[in-house]
């Protein structure tokens, strides 16, 4: 039952009201002498039947929107402010009561108006949405939901191995567009955890994850390309009178390099499982998730190291075997512990990346060695034939810096939390300068490969676009200090740069297309012409031929 109505004002208090407007708002003619009849008519037929929405204090725009939904002007609109203040905000419709109830803090007699509004308006049954959802834009809400899902996935990935063996582990969600995606070891660890316990496939996948397959593949390719580009007359064709490259040597080179790289990567994971657990890219690696024991990982690393060094020793030459062993020691014994001590670890890691090209070049040089085949002849030849190997080593050494500086920038906070000293957080300005400095060296390095006779001069032209692309991204990374997506742009430019340069060098090896042309069209070789003239005797035309006498 509605509460008591407020007493009606006298005619003298409402003498400023336009009765013609009041008559049009009520919908029928109302005598000017009967104000009560006008109020009762408006209460009997409300101006709006839409549900009442709760209002917030200070939300003037919401009040205007609610008033604009009514098809007719409210009758209270034509009363003076003095009249409303005198009678406590007397209202003509339920909507007006709701408005007066929310703004009653500024009007007298608020307690009585609140009682009337509560009696006339039914309680709302709808649940209001949280204020956070109303204020945040849609893409911010999606990012918050994605972060919540990632936190739940990381919490489940750190569970004990027994739980992983009983229930399949789903891979974590894809990384946001601004982050570096997880490495191959983390992806393989998720695949191994989804396999049945004690299965052969689970064990093999776990061991493959220990070897860091993507990094190992890059190391092997960086050794194969210099081996194939070594300047010899014949390409993968056995010969007796001329030096050549042997497919069997190439097989031992790739096998030994793969095993040495797998051993170094496994030892790296054995050394820092606690550090890997603190970083998003490495928190799902095998040792972090207890997919393999430390003892089994050590046995795997020792087996790969021993087998790889022996394959290089007996299948290639002792110089290449020494370089493979040095690569393991530098990466697992010096680079990995140095990451907690000094930012110079990046330069040590770059030296590790420059060793595989020297291994490939020394393997090819051993096939055509004419001396004792020592490391001086293979790597420091007096005639300068080893310059191509050192240029390839410099190319891989230089490439490490723009690639890693961009990669570490995206996870610099995680490096700091893990206690790994990287320039990305210890000295961001120097981090950008180093990336710029080494990003501008690729053009002269490619020209140097043409100058020493490893590739054709066309290689300097065809490699120019990709070199300029990397140089531009390095300049942008330096100018913005890694902001505005420059770090990610430099990272992907470096990812594409190295394979493109290697493929272009292989396609433009010095003299390769000339030999292909002669083999297809059968044009005579200059050496063949000289050899065919050895049995002929040439006479000097200036000399007179001997006189021939005949007897008559």
Curated annotation (Swiss-Prot):
Low complexity bias spans: 150-168
Chain residue ranges for the region called Disordered: 118-185
Catalytic activity: heme b + (2E,6E)-farnesyl diphosphate + H2O = Fe(II)-heme o + diphosphate
Keywords assigned: Heme biosynthesis, Membrane, Mitochondrion, Transferase, Transit peptide, Transmembrane, Transmembrane helix
GO cellular component terms given for this protein: mitochondrial membrane
Pfam families reported for this sequence: UbiA
Family assignment from sequence similarity: Belongs to the UbiA prenyltransferase family.
Protein name: Protoheme IX farnesyltransferase, mitochondrial
Organism (species): Pyricularia oryzae (strain 70-15 / ATCC MYA-4617 / FGSC 8958) (Rice blast fungus)
Gene: COX10
């Amino acid at each position: 039952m509605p509460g008591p109505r407020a007493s009606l004002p006298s005619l003298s208090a409402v003498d400023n009201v336009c009765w013609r407007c009041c008559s049009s708002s009520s919908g029928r003619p109302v005598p000017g002498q009967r104000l009560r009849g006008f109020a009762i008519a408006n209460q009997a037929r409300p101006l709006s039947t839409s549900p009442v929405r709760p209002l917030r204090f200070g939300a003037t725009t919401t009040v205007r929107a609610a008033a604009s939904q009514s098809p007719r002007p409210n009758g209270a609109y034509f009363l003076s402010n003095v009249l409303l203040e005198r009678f406590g905000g007397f209202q003509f419709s339920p909507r007006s009561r709701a408005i007066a109830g929310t703004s009653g803090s500024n009007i007298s007699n608020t307690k009585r108006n609140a009682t009337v509004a509560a009696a006339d308006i039914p309680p709302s049954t709808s649940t209001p949405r949280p204020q956070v959802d109303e204020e945040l834009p849609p893409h911010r809400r999606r990012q918050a939901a994605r972060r919540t899902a990632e936190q739940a996935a990381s919490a489940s990935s750190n569970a004990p191995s027994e739980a992983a063996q009983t229930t399949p582990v789903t891979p974590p969600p894809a990384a946001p567009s601004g982050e570096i995606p997880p490495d191959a070891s983390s992806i393989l660890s998720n695949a191994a955890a989804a396999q049945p316990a004690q299965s052969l496939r689970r064990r093999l996948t776990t061991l493959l994850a220990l070897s860091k397959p993507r990094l190992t593949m890059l190391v092997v390719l960086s050794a194969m390309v210099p081996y194939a580009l070594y300047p010899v007359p014949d390409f993968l064709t056995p010969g007796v009178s001329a030096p050549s490259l042997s497919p069997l040597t190439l097989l031992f080179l790739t096998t030994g390099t793969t095993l040495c790289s797998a051993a170094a990567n496994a030892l790296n994971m054995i050394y820092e499982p606690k550090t890997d657990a603190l970083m998003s890219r490495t928190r799902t690696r095998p040792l972090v998730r207890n997919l393999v024991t430390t003892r089994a990982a050590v046995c795997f690393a020792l087996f790969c190291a021993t087998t790889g060094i022996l394959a290089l020793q007996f299948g290639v030459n002792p110089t290449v075997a020494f370089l493979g062993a040095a690569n393991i020691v530098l990466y697992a014994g010096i680079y990995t512990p140095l990451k907690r001590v000094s930012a110079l670890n990046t330069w040590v890691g770059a030296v590790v990346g420059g060793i595989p090209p020297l291994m490939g070049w020394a393997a090819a040089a051993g096939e055509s060695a004419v001396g004792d085949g020592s490391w001086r002849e293979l790597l420091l030849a007096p005639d300068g034939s080893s310059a191509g190997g050192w240029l390839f080593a410099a190319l891989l050494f230089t490439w490490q810096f723009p690639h890693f500086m961009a990669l570490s920038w995206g996870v610099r906070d995680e490096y700091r939390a893990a206690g790994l000293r990287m320039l990305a957080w210890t000295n961001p300005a120097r981090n950008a300068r180093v990336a710029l400095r080494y990003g501008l060296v690729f053009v002269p390095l490619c020209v140097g490969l043409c100058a020493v006779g490893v590739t054709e001069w066309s290689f300097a032209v065809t490699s120019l676009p990709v070199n300029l692309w990397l140089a531009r991204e390095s300049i942008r990374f330096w100018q913005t200090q890694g902001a505005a997506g420059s770090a990610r742009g430099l990272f992907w430019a470096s990812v594409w740069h190295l394979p493109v340069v290697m493929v272009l060098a292989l396609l433009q090896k010095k003299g390769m297309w000339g030999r292909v042309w002669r083999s297809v069209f059968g044009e005579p070789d200059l050496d063949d012409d000289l050899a065919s003239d050895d049995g002929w005797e040439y006479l000097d035309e200036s000399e007179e031929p001997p006189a021939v006498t005949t007897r008559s």
